Regions:
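Bacterial N-terminal signal peptides that target proteins for export
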Residues: 1-11
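Bacterial N-terminal signal peptides
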Residues: 9-19
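Active-/binding-site microenvironments in catalytic and ligand-binding cores
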Residues: 23-268
């Protein structure tokens, strides 16, 4: 069992252990795992978003307004009420977000039913950037994947596999370019291979969609086979090809079909 897998096995219970006894006295597996993890570098894989952030044209921009008293319509303020809060209105697939199976499959599980153990996984990062100079809309192929495995080894079963394209750099600086289509993404054959031959748990990418075309065959395959994906990821260029962990979570919306997520990597 690799160090990454040992950490995954105990990470979900660390937070409970921290509540039940002081960390200084915690000298069990969880305490040691916590100290190991706390000493590592963390990388945020999530974009900040607001009403100006890029989104698929079929959804429209978010709205964020001061929440108001429903009786008076007066916005709450710290001066008058001692607090303030915001009313958010946006589609579930906004910013860095989770797509659960039910997003594309009427019989698929919703975001509140995705197992907790699938939110902490070994992270593999495939780098598509070497191919983008000659093909800006490159679909990461099986040939590309085999070249990666020849260099870094076989992708472990149970991993989260993310595709690096560096598209995330346009999120704040050039939102219109970020929304361009087509864009670099997955090939359908690679997605099928990862799930069927490598047994990965989930996949993610930096772009607004899974596919380089509007056929959505890769996304349809993922979600209709009971898997989830994370879209619009950031900072994958700051994560090594293998050896890191990913932690990804989201609000527990009952029967939710998607929602902004928070993802981060713990580096080896």
């Amino acid at each position: 069992m690799t160090p990454s897998f040992r950490l995954i096995a105990v990470l979900p219970a660390i937070f409970v252990a921290c509540l039940s006894q002081p960390l200084a006295a915690a000298d069990n597996d969880l305490g040691r795992a916590y100290r190991a993890i706390a000493s590592k570098r963390f990388v945020d894989l999530t974009h900040s978003f607001d009403p100006r952030s890029p989104v698929w044209s079929g959804f429209g921009q978010a709205k964020m307004t001061p929440a108001a008293d429903p009786k008076t319509q007066r916005p709450y303020t710290i001066k008058e009420d001692g607090f303030r809060t915001t009313l958010y209105e946006f589609v579930g697939q906004y910013g860095t977000h989770v797509d659960p199976p039910a997003h594309f499959d009427e019989k698929g599980i919703t975001m509140d039913a995705i197992p907790l153990k699938q939110m902490i996984l070994p992270l593999i990062v495939l780098d598509a950037t070497p191919y983008l100079q000659t093909d800006p809309n490159h679909a990461f192929s099986l040939t590309d994947l085999r070249a990666w495995e020849k260099r870094h080894g076989r992708i472990p079963r149970g991993s989260f596999v993310a595709l690096r394209t560096d598209m995330y750099k346009d999120w704040d600086t050039d939102p219109e370019r970020f929304k361009r289509a087509p864009f670099p993404a997955w090939s359908f054959e690679t997605i099928k291979f990862l799930y069927e031959q490598r047994g990965v748990v989930a996949t993610g990418h930096e772009t607004l969609d899974t596919d380089t075309t509007d056929k959505m065959e890769s996304e349809t395959y993922i979600l209709q086979h009971g898997r989830y994906q994370i879209e619009v990821m950031a900072n994958l260029d700051k994560v090594p090809p293998k050896g890191a962990l990913i932690v990804v979570t989201w609000p527990k919306v009952r029967n939710g079909l998607g929602f902004p997520a928070r993802a981060f990597a713990i580096l080896p």
